[in-house]
Amino acid sequence: MSDLKKAAQKAIELMDLTTLNDDDTDQKVIELCHKAKTPAGNTAAICIYPRFIPIARKTLNELGCEDIKIATVTNFPHGNDDIAIAVLETRAAVAYGADEVDVVFPYRSLMEGNETLGFELVKACKEACGDDAILKVIIESGVLEDPALIRKASELCIDAGADFIKTSTGKVPVNATIEAAEIMMTVISEKNTKVGFKPAGGVRDAAAAGEFLGLAARLLGDDWATPATFRFGASSLLVNLLHTLELGEEAKGPQGY
């Protein structure tokens, strides 16, 4: 198998197949669940809005895909600075049955010089997840932009108990970049290699996925990237990966992200 095909296969196994669109419906989420069961194996998870968790759970169970995790989003997409609301949304997501919660860090507060708020929000949302769900924290690296801010956000999230740090919401002009990924995974290598990394948005093909995986191998070791420590947040990427593996276009995802 070529390196490109190996990257494509691994990226499918590490994918959070995502639909986070304003026009999402039960039917679109059902279709997403079917796409997550790919000819090359199941994706690691799907990522959907909280209200669709029950129908997704029912569909995945019917497909015999109980191993596919259900991720959802809170404090999304703007990363507001109201801790109480972020916690309420996170508790509700867990009550709906989410396995994983992707919460948006209050990145604008950090840009204004407030480091405490982000730490406290992540800490409180981690407590809200308890033992029922893992917490991924979206730092919106494309808006933070400054390497020092990307590093600081990553450090604060890890110190506050995040299980993963994630680049982006996919709702801003600049999403996952190799430059941000290098900073974020360097912080993981320094602080806690059990913390995971999730590039989201803008990873369009197997070659790009391979670049992120290669960076992870260089910074954290060849065997580090597993579903427990690495995810790709993506929708249209799956089509390219299946095409790379010569498995056709059985999985046309929602456009974007």
Swiss-Prot record:
GO terms for biological process: 2-deoxyribose 1-phosphate catabolic process; carbohydrate catabolic process; deoxyribonucleotide catabolic process. The active site is at D102 (proton donor/acceptor), K166 (schiff-base intermediate with acetaldehyde), K198 (proton donor/acceptor). The keyword Membrane does not apply. It catalyses: 2-deoxy-D-ribose 5-phosphate = D-glyceraldehyde 3-phosphate + acetaldehyde. Keywords: Cytoplasm, Lyase, Schiff base. Its main location: cytoplasm. Pathway: Carbohydrate degradation; 2-deoxy-D-ribose 1-phosphate degradation; D-glyceraldehyde 3-phosphate and acetaldehyde from 2-deoxy-alpha-D-ribose 1-phosphate: step 2/2. One of its GO terms (molecular function) is deoxyribose-phosphate aldolase activity. InterPro entries: Aldolase_TIM, DeoC, DeoC/FbaB/LacD_aldolase, DeoC_typeII. Belongs to the DeoC/FbaB aldolase family. DeoC type 2 subfamily. HAMAP family: DeoC_type2 (MF_00592). This is Deoxyribose-phosphate aldolase. It comes from Shewanella woodyi (strain ATCC 51908 / MS32).
